[in-house]
């Protein structure tokens, strides 16, 4: 009897957890056509970066990932790294954001040979400005936003890991 009760409680916990995570994937802040939020964070070198200035003109991709050095986040970053030249040829600037420390971002960038900036959002100002929800473990949800000339043209609130670059390239192919 105790085993059945424990099983049912675990099952109920999984169902509630899955429901909560799925409901957190929608973005309640940005809409297509909105400008890049003017918010600042430190990059992997400790330099203060204003996202609205980085975006400038042309295409700007900002992607959010839960935690450096985890399998899904590494696959997402490496997807963009591997397609970096093609994305650059299409004029796409890329910035990654997580709640990791500046030091962790630097180590992640170096270990994965990432040719783009990674921002440390310890105070959650960037995730807040973009409306990126926090997961049950307190980390930022995986999301991606593509801007053109400072205006949001596409968002992926359930961003892929190893297919992130292909998703962005597919959007660009339609334009």
Regions found by a protein language model. Name each.
Residues 5-7, 14-38:
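N-proximal helix/coil linker or "cap" segments that precede and/or mark the start of modular domains
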Residues 34-35, 139-141:
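Short, small/polar residue-rich loop motifs at catalytic or cofactor-binding pockets
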Residues 39-59:
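A short beta-strand-turn-helix
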Residues 53-74, 80:
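Short active-site neighborhood of thiol/selenol oxidoreductases, capturing the structured segment around
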Residues 69, 74-112, 124-126:
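Structural microenvironment flanking redox-active thiols in thiol-disulfide oxidoreductases
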Residues 117-121:
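Short acidic-hydrophobic, aromatic-tinged amphipathic segments that line or gate anion-handling sites
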Residues 140-175:
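Thiol-/selenol-based redox modules, centered on thioredoxin-like
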């Amino acid at each position: 009897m105790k085993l059945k009760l424990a099983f049912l409680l675990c099952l109920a916990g999984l169902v509630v957890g899955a429901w909560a995570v799925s409901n957190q994937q929608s973005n309640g802040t940005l809409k297509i056509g909105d400008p890049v939020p003017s918010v600042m964070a430190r990059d992997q070198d400790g330099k203060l970066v204003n996202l609205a200035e980085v975006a400038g003109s042309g295409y700007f991709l900002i992607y959010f990932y839960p935690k450096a050095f985890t399998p899904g986040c590494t696959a997402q970053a490496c997807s963009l790294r591997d397609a970096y030249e093609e994305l650059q040829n299409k004029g796409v600037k890329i910035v990654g954001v997580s709640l990791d420390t500046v030091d962790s971002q630097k180590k992640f960038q170096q270990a994965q040979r990432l040719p783009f900036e990674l921002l440390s959002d310890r105070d959650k100002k960037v995730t807040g400005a973009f409306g990126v929800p926090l997961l049950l473990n307190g980390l930022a949800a995986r999301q991606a936003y593509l801007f053109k000339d400072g205006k949001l043209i596409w968002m992926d609130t359930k961003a892929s890991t190893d297919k992130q670059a292909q998703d962005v390239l597919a959007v660009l192919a339609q334009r």
